[in-house]
């Protein structure tokens, strides 16, 4: 059992490393052409959403994606590449389950909470320095 958990952590970690490296590569590639627009972030978020949807559907409806491959690709790679794709997938899952109130709260709470947390962090960093 312990070896299976260690293997899962390694799959997620290696996938996360590769996803993070791919995100960094996208920022190097797209930043010079964006002219101030956060094109790299926008692009990886949209690509990540497509990829997590594609892989998750294959994992659910076929035998093409093993549970280990799903851990590596979805949790690891997509997690390192973009957390936005996980956020959208979780909201879609809530919607699919008919949880409109939870979906609305999660969407609004994440966006509003994210802005509040960002500005709070900025505020406290300015006080601290």
Swiss-Prot record:
GO terms for molecular function: fluoride channel activity; metal ion binding. Signal peptide: none annotated. Its main location: membrane. GO terms for cellular component: plasma membrane. Na(+) is not transported, but it plays an essential structural role and its presence is essential for fluoride channel function. It is a multi-pass membrane protein. It is found in: Cell inner membrane. GO terms for biological process: cellular detoxification of fluoride. It holds the Pfam family CRCB. Coiled coil: none annotated. Na(+) binds at residues 79, 82. Keywords: Cell inner membrane, Cell membrane, Ion channel, Ion transport, Membrane, Metal-binding, Sodium, Transmembrane, Transmembrane helix, Transport. The chain crosses the membrane at residues 1-21, 35-55, 71-91, 105-125. It catalyses: fluoride(in) = fluoride(out). Belongs to the fluoride channel Fluc/FEX (TC 1.A.43) family. Fluoride-specific ion channel. Important for reducing fluoride concentration in the cell, thus reducing its toxicity. This is Fluoride-specific ion channel FluC. It comes from Chlorobium phaeobacteroides (strain DSM 266 / SMG 266 / 2430).
